[in-house]
Amino acid sequence: LHMIHLHWYQYPPMNPMMYPLLLIFMLFTGILCLAGNFVTIWVFMNTKSLRTPANLLVVNLAMSDFLMMFTMFPPMMVTCYYHTWTLGPTFCQVYAFLGNLCGCASIWTMVFITFDRYNVIVKGVAGEPLSTKKASLWILSVWVLSTAWCIAPFFGWNHYVPEGNLTGCGTDYLSEDILSRSYLYIYSTWVYFLPLAITIYCYVFIIKAVAAHEKGMRDQAKKMGIKSLRNEEAQKTSAECRLAKNAMTTVALWFIAWTPCLLINWVGMFARSYLSPVYTIWGYVFAKANAVYNPIVYAIS
């Protein structure tokens, strides 16, 4: 109780119907996420032709999503059943740390996947191909930097506290001291605004490159007096473009998933009167959905 901010005491308990609904949602998404990401990891690791440097990033994305749901799913089921957090203050902090860690790792893995698509499509043969060593270094940097950021609240830079709905835990966005808020400013930049800027930059040039390629193909076809010009190289480029579209779709879905979390943090800092315990649930709903559809998009592609 000592970890719960006074802001939440002004609200009555949530409607009891919210808990079984949330439990059913978590059961559904938990099973789909764990099964989908496990299959993705198993297929990529046991199919030799798929063990490429680029696909190491896809496997890492599946691993981060799998770990997120593996660590979030059981505690959420327990808290929804009891209508409150019953796992103690220490596990509350561990729960929040693991959720932030896997989310941050997922975000930056998506960024590196996008950058790899940019390197393949925009730079083409002029770009340096992704090697297994480079992909491994990218993955290592993702986990090291994510751990560094997410472990900071254990040392007093912000704190991990129960959410207002008492079914989960996260960063403290209600404390007004500059130390706590500075963490949220920098962390929001690191896990949201910077990845968004990099992603937009990459896809602007990807779209330009695809448009220029298609225009060149049409112009060449006109000169040769034929309807279309599609050789083997063009088909390969077209396949790469389809992969880029799949990646773009996944990134867009990811930002839809994580924007509610950002808004909850910033509303909590600057307009807390608008933030009720029910609203904080939406951050869970959208974030957990992201871990479900990532393996679907990448497994198909």
UniProtKB/Swiss-Prot annotation:
This protein's record includes keyword tRNA processing: no
Q: Does the keyword Disulfide bond apply?
A: yes
For the Extracellular compartment, the record's topological domain ranges are 1-18, 79-92, 156-182, 268-278
Sites where N6-(retinylidene)lysine occurs are at K288
Q: Which residues cross the membrane?
A: 19-43, 56-78, 93-115, 135-155, 183-204, 246-267, 279-300
- Detail the disulphide connectivity of this chain as listed in its UniProt entry: C92-C169
One annotated Gene Ontology cellular component of this protein: cell projection
User: Where does the UniProt entry place glycosylation sites?
Assistant: N165
Q: Which GO terms describe its biological process?
A: phototransduction; visual perception
- Which keywords belong to this entry? Cell membrane, Cell projection, Chromophore, Disulfide bond, G-protein coupled receptor, Glycoprotein, Membrane, Phosphoprotein, Photoreceptor protein, Receptor, Retinal protein, Sensory transduction, Transducer, Transmembrane, Transmembrane helix, Vision
Q: What is its main location?
A: membrane
InterPro entries on file: GPCR_opsins, GPCR_Rhodpsn, GPCR_Rhodpsn_7TM, Opsin, Opsin_lateye, Retinal_BS
What post-translational modification information does the record give?
Contains one covalently linked retinal chromophore.
Which loops or segments lie on the Cytoplasmic side of the membrane, by the record? Answer: 44-55, 116-134, 205-245
Cell compartment(s), UniProt: Cell projection, Rhabdomere membrane
Q: Where is this motif: 'Ionic lock' involved in activated form stabilization?
A: 116-118
- Bilayer topology term: Multi-pass membrane protein
Q: What is the top-level taxon of the source organism?
A: Eukaryota
Annotated family: Belongs to the G-protein coupled receptor 1 family. Opsin subfamily.
State whether it acts alone or in a complex, and with which partners, per the record: Homodimer. Interacts with GNAQ.
The free-text function statement in the UniProt record for this protein reads: Photoreceptor required for image-forming vision at low light intensity. Can use both retinal and 3-dehydroretinal as visual pigment. Light-induced isomerization of 11-cis to all-trans retinal triggers a conformational change that activates signaling via G-proteins. Signaling via GNAQ probably mediates the activation of phospholipase C.
From the Swiss-Prot or TrEMBL record, give the protein name: Rhodopsin
Organism of provenance: Cambarus hubrichti (Salem cave crayfish)
